[in-house]
Every structure is written in structure tokens, then in C-alpha cells.
């Protein structure tokens, strides 16, 4: 499918021992820095537009830097930021490089707290100023805050408006920056609360500072800050005084995992990242529950605390279908089941002619679902063989057994993805010609005009790649029929929690439904839905419902599929094409513990999601449909 930009990746490490401990046990005081690099590289799939890292050095002397940050843009950002950090060590002697005490006192990025972030922009904004972590500085260590996260907030407009009403003038319009300012303000209040308490105990000077740093409660800061936000998020932060936290949204939309022992506390967006980096079993890695925060105090005391009541069970199902790496043991099985569950509709599509059907997949994220599909067809053929043998009225001969048992699933590597072709040629026909060559095929892999070709993808969003590249190149093999299978259901609604698909008109399913309404003289339903959405937008977001769902009600999945085929069929192509989508029921059966399916069903977990969906339909009508 078209590559989707999606939620970012986070990584955090808190060392619980002095640097000398890691030098002695692991041969380097850079243990955490090296592990952070591995954690970020293992999550490169989550962000290729930029990366950043930050470090806090505990116990730094006044006049010496204790917070360090590097950020960079581009696909090589991870290598670049670690290259910059390591450049500080290139002129050291071997003795200095092995001296943890020297490193602690003199070197940048020789600290106890580390944070990393990989960025994918889903807002269209670019520039180094949008790359995490964001940093808020102050002369008081406890008031310094470094923030990063995997999130998209739906109510930034409302919060921005509230801030400007108060007389504030935020320098950058982004959810991260606004969160940084809000959280920084609440952190200031928390520090001042402890300052007052210390003064009441008649403390003076550095005794007050030490008291503040020992008694700051980040849970108070999170409770007063995060209640204002609507969206899916994992928010991570470190303070100059040594507090560390990671909080997950109360709907459980975005994922976070952690591990702790007597040496380290670590956080990542995906479980296998921690397993591989720290050689752990899956059972040793804990999932951060919705509405809770992992908190590590300056003294290393670690706890998980509830910040907000859980508001739902809406973990993103797209994480399991597409975004997360398939190396997670549960995700691997779920993706296989998504493929296996599609056997019956595929059989129907090829008229049960398995002997003359070749199976393949669109590289690369559909590979695991493909294995599941093959497994399902192997089971189907085995059952067919058993039934054939059982129905014989005699003991089968060797030749008969060979004929029956000789049936097998014909799987081939049909599609190959070449290097990503840049659309630097602006003239339309040339660009289309370039796009058509993103994929290549294995010539001679099917029997022309005899074999059906079944090819599975993880999902179909816009349909652009199908129309401009995949269908054209597959047609060169001259199959009898092409069946394109999606392991995900039809994507019908926008996402506002971190996936780059916020406009209805981008979805081939939505465009097909609108076209069907036009062809059947049902335009009144479009206008009624428009008026209904405007009426909903006049209400508080907490009271809004989603009228956009009515657009799809007149049609079956098959009717929409047929219209999509008609719309995406390349000019001049005559080979029969059929689409097969996963059902909602099949999705829930394969992925029972991740119930966030708003892009398929229109059931948004937060009020802000429903509001923005209504706004998206209004925008479509006013900016596209009525034009």
C-alpha cells in the first residue's frame, strides 16, 4: 500500500547505578548511550523525518552544563545525532575514555538519564524546530523540562485559543510546544509549592534547592496538565533535577512498554525493541496501562502511578496491522490470523479453482499476513485431500494417491519493490510513468490467461499505488483474474491520533461511496449529512455524534468494492479485478485486545476525534464537492 506516515517512536533509559558500575561490568560508561542508539535504530520504522536525543547529568556543579540535546532532520538523523554526541570523545586518550569519573565531570552526554525520539510528521510541518525533544530552560534545575512524545492532540486549537485569551503568545503552533509550555508552567507551580514548604521549615539557600529536588512530584504536574488534552499520546519527559516520566493516554490509543531491574529503567514504543536491546523474554517487558505514568524520581525510586482514570479500551488496531514491527510474538500471530481468515472470500473470488491460482503479496509489510493466508490454504487443501480419499469406494492405488496428494498451494514471489522513485519530474504523464515502475514482477511465474493471481496487502487507503503501479505491472503477467486482498477492513474514516490520513477525500472507499450516491441519484443524502455535520459542530464536542457513517449505509461492502475497482482500473486494462477486504468481525477475532477501529467503523474513542471527523466532511463538501 502507499506508505503512511504515522506515530513516532520514543526511547528512554534511566541508569540506577554510578557510571563506574557500567564501566566495570560492561566495559564502558557509555552503556546507556549505546543502548539508546540501538533502541532508536530498532524503531526506525516509526520515524524517518527526524530524530533527537537528550541527556541529563545528575549532580552537576554550577557553571557546568548538565542537560544536553542533539536534533537532526532526514532519514539519517539517528546516525547524525549520535555522530555529533560521539564527536565529543574522539580526541580523548584511551585512559580518559575508560575513566568514568572523568567522563561524569567533564564530558557531554555522560549522564544518567537519556531520552530519544524518532519523528514522522502527520501535520505537514517541517523544520528542526519541530523535531523532538523540546527543551524549556531555567536557572533552577528542577524547572528545566525536556519533552518528547508519540502523539497527536485533537484539541490544540482550543488550548491555543485559551492561552491567547490569557494574554500568552506561544512562539510555535504545535501540540508539543503548547504541551511543553503548559507542563512547564505546572512544573513551575510544583517547584514553588515546595519552595514555600521549605521556607516554612526555615530552610535557606541550597537546602531549599535540595528539598525542592527531593520533593517535586511529577504526578502532580501530569495530573494538572494532561487533563486538558484530547488525543492519543505517550508523553515522555526528563527534568534538569533528574525526574523521568512516561505517560500513556487514558484511552490506551498509543502504545508504550517498559522494563526495570536494579540497573536500569527503560521505555520504548514497541516490546521487541526492549527484548532485543536488553536480551529479555516477552513476559519480562511490561505494558504501560492507559492513564498511568511510569515515574522515576531523582533518587532512582521507580513507580507506576495512575494519573487519569481509564476512559476506554481503544488501543490502535493499525499498530497491529501495519505500524509496529512484526517481530513481536503477538503481532506476528495476529497478522497471520488476519491472512488466514480471508480463505473463504478468496476461494469464492477464484471460483474455488485453487489448482489454477498463484498466491503472492505486496512487499513488504503484508508478508506475515501472506504466511497466514498460505497456512489457511494448506489446511483447506489437506481437508479436501482427506475428503477425496474418504469418498473413494476402494483402497486407492499408488497412482490415485499421487494424483490426490499432488495438489499444493502455488505460492510465488510475484512483486518486487524497487528503490523509492522521487517525484522530481513535475509533468503529469512523466510522473505517472515513474510511479508505475516502483514495483516489478517475476516474469514467467504464472501461466498467462490460465492462472488467477491472488495478491495480499496489509491495507488499501488511497488506492494511488494500486492504480498507478501495482495493477499495471501485474497485468503484464496476463493473469486470468487479479484478486487484490486487504488484510485490513475498508478504511472509511480519518485518523486524528497520529496517522497521516486526515482527509476523507483521500480514501478510495469514501470516493467510491460518493460516486455511487451520485450515480443512484441519492445526492440528497450527501447534503443531509453535510447539514447534520454542521449541526453537530454547533454542539460541545462531548455531545457530538458521527453522521458521516450514513454515507456508507445504502451500500454493501461488495458494491463499494466493485466501484473502487472501476475507479482504480488503469486505462486500457481488461483483466478482471476483484477486491477482498477483511471484515470488521474478522479484525476483532484476530486482534481482540486492540479495539481501536475508528478508521474502519467511525467510532472515535475521544470527543475530539468525532468533532474533527465532522469538520472533515464539512471541509470536503465546501472545498471539493461544491466546487
Where are these regions (language model features)?
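Conserved short alpha-helical segments that host acidic/polar catalytic motifs at enzyme active sites
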Residues: 1-289, 295-358, 362-363
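Amphipathic alpha-helical
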Residues: 197-216, 377-393, 400-414, 420
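PRPP-dependent phosphoribosyltransferase catalytic core
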Residues: 226, 241-243, 248, 260, ...
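Phosphate/ATP-binding catalytic cores across multiple sugar-kinase/actin-like superfamilies
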Residues: 228-231, 334-355, 368, 373-376, ...
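Active-site proximal loops enriched in glycine and acidic residues that flank catalytic Cys/His/Asp
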Residues: 237, 248-249, 269-271, 298, ...
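Conserved hydrophobic/aromatic pocket- or pore-lining residues that grip, position, or stack substrates
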Residues: 294, 342, 359, 373, ...
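Terminal amphipathic helices with adjacent charged low-complexity linkers/tails
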Residues: 300-316, 361-395
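Extended, hydrophobic alpha-helical segments in both membrane/secreted and soluble proteins
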Residues: 359, 366-373, 377, 411, ...
Amino acid at each position: 500500500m502507499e506508505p503512511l506516515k504515522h506515530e513516532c517512536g520514543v526511547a528512554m533509559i534511566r541508569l540506577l547505578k554510578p557510571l563506574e558500575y557500567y564501566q566495570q561490568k560492561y566495559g564502558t560508561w557509555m552503556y546507556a548511550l549505546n543502548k539508546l542508539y540501538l533502541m532508536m535504530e530498532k524503531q526506525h520504522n516509526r520515524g524517518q523525518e527526524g530524530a533527537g536525543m537528550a541527556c541529563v547529568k545528575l549532580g552537576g556543579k554550577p557553571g557546568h552544563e548538565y542537560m544536553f540535546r542533539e536534533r537532526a532532520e532526514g532519514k539519517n538523523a539517528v546516525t547524525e545525532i549520535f555522530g555529533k554526541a560521539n564527536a565529543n570523545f574522539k580526541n580523548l586518550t584511551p585512559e580518559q575514555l575508560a575513566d568514568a569519573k572523568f567522563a561524569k565531570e567533564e564530558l557531554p552526554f555522560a549522564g544518567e538519564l537519556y531520552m530519544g525520539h524518532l519523528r514522522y510528521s502527520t501535520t505537514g510541518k517541517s523544520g528542526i524546530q519541530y523535531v523532538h525533544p523540546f527543551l524549556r530552560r531555567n536557572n533552577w534545575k528542577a524547572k528545566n523540562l525536556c519533552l518528547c512524545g508519540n502523539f497527536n492532540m485533537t484539541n490544540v486549537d482550543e488550548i491555543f485559543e485559551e492561552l491567547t485569551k490569557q494574554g500568552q503568545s506561544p512562539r510555535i503552533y504545535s501540540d508539543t510546544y503548547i504541551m511543553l509550555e503548559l507542563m512547564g508552567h505546572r512544573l513551575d507551580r510544583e517547584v514553588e509549592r515546595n519552595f514555600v514548604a521549605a521556607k516554612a521549615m526555615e530552610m535557606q539557600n541550597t537546602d531549599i534547592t535540595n528539598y525542592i529536588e527531593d520533593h517535586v512530584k511529577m504526578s502532580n504536574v501530569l495530573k494538572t496538565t494532561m487533563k486538558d488534552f484530547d488525543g492519543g499520546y505517550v508523553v515522555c519527559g526528563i527534568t534538569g533535577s533528574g525526574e523521568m516520566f512516561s505517560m500513556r493516554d487514558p484511552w490506551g490509543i498509543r502504545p508504550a512498554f517498559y522494563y526495570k531491574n536494579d540497573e536500569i529503567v527503560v521505555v520504548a514504543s514497541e516490546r521487541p525493541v526492549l527484548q532485543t536491546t536488553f536480551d529479555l523474554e516477552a513476559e519480562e517487558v511490561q505494558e504501560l496501562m492507559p492513564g498511568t505514568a511510569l515515574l522515576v524520581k531523582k533518587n532512582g525510586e521507580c513507580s507506576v502511578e495512575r494519573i487519569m482514570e481509564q476512559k476506554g479500551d481503544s488501543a490502535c488496531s493499525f499498530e497491529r496491522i501495519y505500524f509496529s514491527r512484526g517481530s513481536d510474538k503477538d503481532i506476528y500471530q495476529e497478522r497471520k490470523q488476519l491472512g488466514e481468515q480471508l480463505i473463504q472470500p478468496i476461494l469464492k473470488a477464484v471460483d474455488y479453482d485453487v489448482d489454477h491460482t498463484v498466491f503472492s503479496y505486496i512487499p513488504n509489510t503484508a508478508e506475515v499476513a501472506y504466511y497466514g493466508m498460505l497456512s489457511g490454504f494448506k489446511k483447506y487443501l489437506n481437508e479436501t485431500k482427506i475428503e477425496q480419499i474418504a469418498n473413494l469406494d476402494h483402497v486407492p492405488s499408488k497412482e490415485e494417491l499421487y494424483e490426490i496428494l499432488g495438489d499444493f498451494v502455488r505460492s510465488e514471489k510475484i512483486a518486487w519493490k524497487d528503490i523509492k522513485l522521487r517525484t522530481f519530474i513535475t509533468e503529469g504523464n512523466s510522473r505517472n510513468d515513474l510511479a508505475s515502475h516502483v514495483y516489478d514482477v517475476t516474469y514467467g511465474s504464472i501461466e498467462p490467461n490460465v492462472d488467477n493471481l491472488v495478491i495480499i496487502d496489509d491495507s488499501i487507503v488511497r488506492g494511488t499505488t494500486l492504480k498507478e503501479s501495482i495493477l499495471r505491472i501485474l497485468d503484464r503477467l496476463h493473469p486470468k483474474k487479479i484478486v487484490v486482498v486487504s488484510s485490513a477492513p475498508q478504511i472509511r474514516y480519518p485518523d486524528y491520533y497520529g496517522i497521516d490520513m486526515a482527509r476523507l477525500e483521500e480514501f478510495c472507499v469514501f470516493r467510491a461511496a460518493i460516486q455511487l450516491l451520485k450515480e443512484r441519484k441519492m445526492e440528497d443524502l450527501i447534503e443531509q449529512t453535510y447539514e447534520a455535520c454542521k449541526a453537530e459542530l454547533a454542539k460541545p464536542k462531548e455531545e457530538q455524534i458521527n453522521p458521516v457513517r450514513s454515507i456508507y449505509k445504502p451500500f454493501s461492502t461488495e458494491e463499494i468494492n466493485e466501484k473502487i475497482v472501476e475507479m482504480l482500473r488503469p486505462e486500457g486494462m481488461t483483466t478482471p479485478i476483484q477486491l477482498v477486504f477483511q471484515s470488521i468481525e474478522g479484525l476483532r477475532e484476530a486482534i481482540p485486545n486492540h479495539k481501536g477501529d475508528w478508521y474502519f467503523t467511525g467510532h472515535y474513542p475521544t470527543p475530539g476525534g468525532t468533532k474533527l471527523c465532522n469538520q472533515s466532511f464539512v471541509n470536503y463538501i465546501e472545498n471539493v464537492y461544491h466546487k
